[in-house]
Amino acid sequence: MRRTAVEKAEFIDKEYREYLRSSYSFGNDKYQDLYEKRLNEEELYKGPFLHMSMPFKKGRSLNQLIDKNIVDSDFRKLGNIHLNRTLYLHQEKSIVKIADKRNIVVTTGTGSGKTECFLYPIINEIMKEKRNGNKEPGIRAMFLYPMNALVNDQIDRLREILSSYPEITYGSFTGDTPENYKDGGTREKFAENNGIASLPDNELVTREEMRKNPPSLLFTNYSMLEYMLIRPKDSVLFNPENL
């Protein structure tokens, strides 16, 4: 049975009171009655609070931006990208401004597609580089996240987008990243352990791989970045020829 927001709040309140009621028994009728009375009278939570927001303004679609030569036509080779779906206006503006070599700061609401504001322009710039003949390995963009869970979420998303575009490599360098396949098993074993049906060739999964051929897109966290900057064996990632 589906409940409204108010009904859900009332259900949670009722269940929580039942939990508290069943968790404490005083063995004294007077104290038990007093406890029951206070439990029924007390306000155990605030709310629910409802927040209304207007829909975000719509912009042009990726296909329209491709037709205007703002976005590279190789975007049509990517997976899990809706080329004809209209972008939000702030997403379109981000793509256009970065394509025009301008800096941006994105401040917009939850669920408004902030990731696309930086991910699409970065992929677009790398595609343009490769079209102009720059196909050397090296880090083109670094993504810093406070938690490994967020890194993993983005890697899962990139795996869908770039699986059919092997020219752009990517990888995550965190505490969970194995040093080599001896530590993490084979690529097939890594895929199996992480519930991945097929691991794309352009996803680098070991530290050795990334030191040998730095990925175009590197995902890490603040703490690991500090270690990478001071460890001699990781310095190869940041050599000028790899940036």
What residue ranges belong to the model's regions?
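Helicase-associated low-complexity/disordered flanking segments
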Residues: M1-K93, I168, E192
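Short gly/ser/thr-rich secondary-structure transition/capping motifs
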Residues: L87, A197-E203, Y227-D234
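Walker A/P-loop NTP-binding motif
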Residues: V96-I104, E116-E136, R157-R159
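Pre-Walker A (Motif I) flank of P-loop NTPase domains
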Residues: D100-V106, P137-A141, P214-S216
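The conserved Walker
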Residues: T108-S112
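Conserved Walker A/P-loop ATP-binding site and its immediately adjacent core
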Residues: E116, P137-S163, T169-K182, M224-Y227
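Conserved motor-coupling elements within RecA-like helicase/translocase cores
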Residues: N180-L218
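SF2 helicase catalytic motif II
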Residues: P215-Y227, S235-L243
